[in-house]
């Protein structure tokens, strides 16, 4: 029988535009009863360097490696890749190839803000 384990799949730390330090975020997510989180800072994976097995074990909180690709064409959550997949030059014409590369790296991807219609700062999803 499958067991439901709630996860926070889209969160940021001070490594991009969040307010929490990595340990604070993990502690907060665990305090709310989540089993884990995907650390998805904007165009940064440096926060993952602060995630330790001890921190996860102490809080009973699994941390999935992720990143939020933040481009002029939209924001894409990329979770679970075993290597870096370059987002810097992805365009609507090359998104299919980028998605194939994410999959080849063992990752999954999803639109970060599917209902955002766009603004000068948040371009929505124009993939």
Language-model regions, residue ranges each:
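A metal-dependent hydrolase metal-coordination microenvironment
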Residues: 1-108, 112, 119-127
């Amino acid at each position: 029988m499958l067991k439901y384990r709630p996860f926070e799949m889209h969160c940021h730390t001070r490594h991009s535009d969040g307010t929490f330090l990595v340990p604070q975020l993990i502690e907060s997510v665990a305090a709310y009863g989540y089993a884990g989180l995907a650390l998805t800072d904007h165009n940064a994976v440096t926060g993952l360097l602060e995630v330790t097995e001890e921190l996860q074990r102490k809080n009973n909180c699994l941390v999935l490696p992720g990143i939020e690709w933040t481009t002029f064409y939209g924001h894409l959550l990329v979770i679970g890749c075993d290597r870096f997949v370059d987002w810097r030059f992805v365009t609507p014409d090359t998104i299919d190839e980028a998605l194939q590369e994410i999959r080849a790296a063992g990752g999954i991807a999803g639109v970060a803000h599917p209902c955002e219609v766009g603004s000068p700062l948040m371009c929505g999803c124009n993939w």
